[in-house]
């Protein structure tokens, strides 16, 4: 709306003669221009507000954030499921570890009892022979039961000494084999699953070349 029309509307309205066709026409034009201007301004304000706050864009952003939260929650739940499954598997595999370790001590005692029988005594004493056979059967049955529950014997003879599975008690001079090669087993070792239940107590060779030790170690990993 022009300044002249504003002046007419504000200052000359009271002096306007409505009976005069020219004044009425001028007043009508001023009113039409006023309404047109304010209608345009109102529409521009609405469009500006729509640009500032777009409901659709806001909903899309919120939906994206919720989707990201859902994906993170799903990932956390999957990690929890895997960790729980692993813990359950470990508990099932290793729950008898302490019991199995105690049974290995019993097996050791049974073997010591058998070794204590003098040579030839079994053949000369039928009762002692039957007793020894019964002890052997008991020991074999007990070890078979432990094997069914994941207990396995370590066979370190001829292998390179590994502190994770072996416990060295003494050295055996022997220049024909690489250093730290297991030469003698004093007490058998056992594992359960991937864990050492009891390390094997061994004697290791002393005097072999380090080069031979390296070559043997490489060959064992090929």
Curated annotation (Swiss-Prot):
GO cellular component, one term: cytoplasm
Key words, A-Z: Chaperone, Cytoplasm, Stress response
Listed name of the protein: Protein GrpE
One Pfam family from the record: GrpE
Domain of life of the native organism: Bacteria
Keyword Cytoplasm: yes
Compartments, record wording: Cytoplasm
Function in brief: Participates actively in the response to hyperosmotic and heat shock by preventing the aggregation of stress-denatured proteins, in association with DnaK and GrpE. It is the nucleotide exchange factor for DnaK and may function as a thermosensor. Unfolded proteins bind initially to DnaJ; upon interaction with the DnaJ-bound protein, DnaK hydrolyzes its bound ATP, resulting in the formation of a stable complex. GrpE releases ADP from DnaK; ATP binding to DnaK triggers the release of the substrate protein, thus completing the reaction cycle.
Molecular function GO labels: adenyl-nucleotide exchange factor activity; protein homodimerization activity; protein-folding chaperone binding; unfolded protein binding
Listed GO biological process terms: protein folding
PANTHER family the UniProt entry points to: GRPE PROTEIN, GRPE PROTEIN HOMOLOG, MITOCHONDRIAL
Assembly, per entry: Homodimer.
Organism this protein belongs to: Bartonella tribocorum (strain CIP 105476 / IBS 506)
Signal peptide: none
Location of the region described as Disordered in the Swiss-Prot/TrEMBL record: 1-21
Family: Belongs to the GrpE family.
């Amino acid at each position: 709306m022009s300044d002249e029309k504003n002046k007419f509307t504000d200052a000359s309205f009271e002096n306007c003669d409505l009976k005069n066709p020219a004044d009425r026409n001028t007043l009508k034009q001023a009113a039409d221009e006023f309404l047109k201007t304010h209608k345009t301004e109102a529409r521009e304000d609405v469009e500006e507000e729509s640009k500032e706050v777009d409901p659709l864009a806001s909903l899309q952003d919120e939906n994206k954030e919720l989707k990201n939260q859902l994906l993170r929650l799903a990932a956390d739940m999957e990690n929890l499921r895997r960790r729980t499954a692993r813990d359950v598997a470990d508990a099932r595999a290793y729950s008898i570890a302490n019991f199995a370790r105690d049974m290995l001590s019993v097996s050791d005692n049974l073997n010591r009892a058998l070794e204590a029988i003098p040579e030839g005594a079994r053949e000369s004493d039928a009762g002692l022979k039957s007793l020894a056979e019964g002890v052997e059967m008991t020991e074999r049955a007990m070890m078979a039961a432990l094997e069914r529950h994941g207990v396995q014997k370590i066979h370190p003879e001829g292998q390179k000494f590994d502190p994770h599975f072996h416990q060295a008690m003494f050295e055996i001079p022997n220049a024909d084999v690489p250093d730290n090669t297991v030469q003698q087993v004093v007490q058998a070792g056992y594992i359960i699953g991937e864990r050492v239940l009891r390390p094997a107590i061994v004697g290791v060779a002393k005097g072999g070349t380090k080069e031979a030790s390296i070559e043997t170690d490489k060959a064992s990993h090929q």
